Each structure stands twice: as C-alpha cells, then as structure tokens.
Amino acid sequence: GLFGKIDHRLHTMFETMLTLSQSRGIDSTGVAAIGTKVNIVKDTVFALDLLKSAEYKDKVLKNKNLCLLGHNRAATRGVVSKDNAHPFKQGNIVLVHNGTLWKNIKTDANVDTDSESICAGINEKGVAEVWKEMDGDATVLYFDTAKGTFNMVSNGKRPLVFAYTADMCTLI
C-alpha cells in the first residue's frame, strides 16, 4: 500500500509491487483508491488483468488518491468470489489482511471471511477490542475514512515491512 503524496512514479511502483506479489495470492486481486471518496476495484483475476481493466482505469487512475491499498488473495476461508476479494469496506474502515484467523471476530455484520470480520469488527468496536479477540495470524492495513488515518497492525505472525520515500511525504 501507499499513503501520502502519490505521484505517477509512486503509482507505477504500487502497480509493480501488486504485480510482483500476485504469486502469493492467485485467487483474486483488489485495489482501494482513497481520495475524496473510496473506490474499490476487485475481481477473481491476476493483478495484471485487474490493472488493465476499464474499471481500474476509471476508478483508480483518473482520481487523485491519498491512499492506495492493494491485495492478492490466497483463499483460506470463504469461497473464491469477487465479494470475498480484498479490500473490504465496512462503515468507515477500508482494510486488507494477510493471515488466517481460526475463528471470525464477533460482529453484527454478515461476513463470509475472517478478513471481512476484522474489518467489520474494527468499524464496530475499534482495533484494540478486535485485537483482544484475535485468534490466528494477522497483519492488517486499514484506512479510517472518518479520522483520515492510515493504520498498520500486526500480531507478529505475518510480515509487515514499510518505508518512507526520501522526502518523507509517502509511506510505502
């Protein structure tokens, strides 16, 4: 994902990272583009195919984005479908998750995957409460549209690697 000042060079880097990581998750690909509104493009295709789609070009490339979240899914719980592809949006939370939970987070939302239960749980009761319930592996990136914040959380069982651009204006 990227958060901050996203120019053409960084957008190209985001697409390259998404494409290079597609071997880690071949069941579906998705991108959330967050600027003045949230646009999510996802499908049961490889990253290269999603990046070539008219929907991606219209909803992602044509907008000025503050945050880009990308994900390639390897299905562990829940069927392979467009709805079960990441990113997820529940209320103010836009989220991607790497890992597997042994049981879903308790939530009022109707969810089909462990990842979507994390998203709904954070939206309903906050990340601290969700993390107390966490049973499994989880690294989560999420954007809170109400607070305008980008958040990274991990229980250490899945990798979380990040860096800043040289000008310190963008988190990668």
What are these regions (language model features)?
Residues 1-172:
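Conserved short alpha-helical segments that host acidic/polar catalytic motifs at enzyme active sites
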